[in-house]
């Protein structure tokens, strides 16, 4: 926001030379640019050093706005909070950094984010890249992670969503993701669940029921229509 306003003011003065910004205005522009440069933490996860949930949402919204296509992979660390209790905060944070560095090296800049305490999210731009990442990530999690000479076996579930086939808006992305993670959690360790037509239909049916129930609660009742066969 700071950069956008500052750029607009500079552009205005360049385009319309008769409009001169005062010294106070110029100072404000410089302050806004300085704050933007000095505040990268807004988009960085302080634990892992990679992009955070805010950065991910900004990227995904931009991708959806440009009407492109691609894949979003969510890697959920099963039972991470139980492991956190055993290892303690410092070692758990080191474990997250190890995972973040691995995914960053594998996926590249602007493609991996630490979006929750027990979850990382990755962008894949093509089907081929998505398939490669699925295989590489699953293979890596089959081996232990080493933190302070402790060997840690981590279970994970990976869910894969394609846009715009599976979702076209942020709310739909989050709803579908939770539905897929719920299904993945029933399937055991190191599982990969990819949205397909059947799963999408199941999710949308359940979503309609949830909306109907919420409306019934709000309106304190609902109508039932019976059509004899």
Region locations from a protein language model:
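Conserved long alpha-helical elements within nucleotide-processing catalytic cores of c-di-GMP signaling
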Residues: 49-71, 78-104, 113-117, 127-135, ...
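Short hydrophobic alpha-helical segments used for membrane anchoring or interfacial signaling
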Residues: 73-77, 160-162
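Interfacial "cap-and-anchor" motif at the non-cytosolic start of specific transmembrane alpha-helices
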Residues: 1-43
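A cytosolic-side transmembrane-helix exit/cap motif
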Residues: 40-52
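A short glycine-enriched loop-to-beta-strand structural element that forms part of the catalytic core
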Residues: 113-123, 140, 144-182, 187-196
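The cytosolic transmitter module of two-component sensor histidine kinases
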Residues: 24, 52, 92, 130, ...
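Hydrophobic scaffolding residues in well-structured cytosolic catalytic/regulatory domains
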Residues: 56, 120, 223
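Active-site core of bacterial EAL-family cyclic-dinucleotide phosphodiesterase domains
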Residues: 205-229
